[in-house]
Amino acid sequence: MPLPPELLQAVSSPGGGKIALVLGAGCSVEPPTNIPVSSVCSTEIHRCLVADGILQDGECPNPADLSAVADAVFIKRNSQRDVVERLRDQYGLKLATPNDGYWIAAALLFEGVISSVVTLNYDLALSTALSELGAGKIVGVVERPEDLVHQKAINLYYLHRNANAADPELWVLRTAALNLEWKGHWEPIIASKVLAAPVVIFAGLGTPVAVLIESTKLLQAALPAVTKLYLADPGDIARSSFFQALALDASVYIRSEWGELMEALSKRLLEEQIAKLGQAAGRKTQEDNLPNEDIAGLLGALQNMGIVKVGKLRAHWLLYEKPYRIFEENVLGLLADLLLALATMARVSGAEAVIIEDGRVEFRRAGRTVASFIIASGNGYRGKLAVEAEVQKRRTKYSQCPAAALVGGTSASWTTPPTPPTDIVEGEESKNDILRGPTALPLFHIGELRDNHGLIQQVVP
């Protein structure tokens, strides 16, 4: 279903930080994370506990409620270790693979669009996504109340601890433990920092487990009156136990899967980023008296790639040290310059410029690739030697070996050999390797290509 206009405005507003997320077990159900909802996990763990002689049939009044199972085991053994170890190990919580929703959530945290995420889950899928994108210096991860002193401006909070907690007794499975930690540690921070965002979305809350319902009610009670709350769930509103428990108005219910929700949010954000990139290209054309190039197809290709892949593409093109490069106004001119140059090359050569997810650009004619390039910007301060060294270092990471690099945004004068390699698609054979060795890639500056259309026709034959 379409997202509410207020939510679309919040995700695209300048400055960001207007949205906070509260995530439940339903967010980890989608593949490849593939962790079942709490009721399924609880029922299976209860079966194992009975089979292993730790519980007897009937000792737990509700085997589908993980809190009830934990309470039953705690009453018998004064410990919840038997529940925690089975939950952690059977479902691979430490090494959970991020699904698309988690990748997008990590990107939106990194971008500063989402100010905070509070997760009620124990798996580390979202932490893994943040790490893989290189967000460690920007996004704080608060796994326990003791970590609150290390929080950053943007944070991921594990309200119930997570699979990294070495002591199984510290996992918040029972409502008594939740209330103790909430009043003693979480309440002032969550209320003043996390839930102060103008918009809070509860997503994937899933099965109405006692500790989850209690957590959600505590979070709801801490919301400022001006905060707009939404509940996203894939099911029918009449069957949403959390919707009933929170006594919400039907207008705030969003019927959506977790990944679908994040895709819709990120699509609106990316539309804004692409629009600003197009505007930057217009300014660049006017300021430098360049030909009016048609970059609509290239911008459309970026929109179709999605926010995570576009962030990775920015990192490739700007020679960034991390896997993901956030959107910033100060690099728009650099990116626009590269896109305009690609459009010029396509127009002059009569070939189609196709952006590849790994950062390369292929020029195709009649369905055949006639040239393949790395794209590299000096970011306005790197000279030829620095760019060349960085390009050579990165060339082995591409899915297919490019034969040359297109370079822009450099700090000094640039000269390139006038003769391109014999085969612009495959490159030249190394004289030092009986196979095809690491010969230096030719570098072509986009300024030189703009001034010499004959060179364009050579490099895109």
Model-derived regions: residue spans:
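Active-site gating loop/helix substructures
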Residues: 134-195
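Mobile, glycine- and charge-enriched loop segments
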Residues: 46, 54-95
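Active-site metal-binding loops of divalent metal-dependent hydrolases
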Residues: 25-26, 122, 161, 205
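Short acidic/glycine-rich loop or secondary-structure boundary segments that cap or lie
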Residues: 126, 165-168, 210-211, 239-240
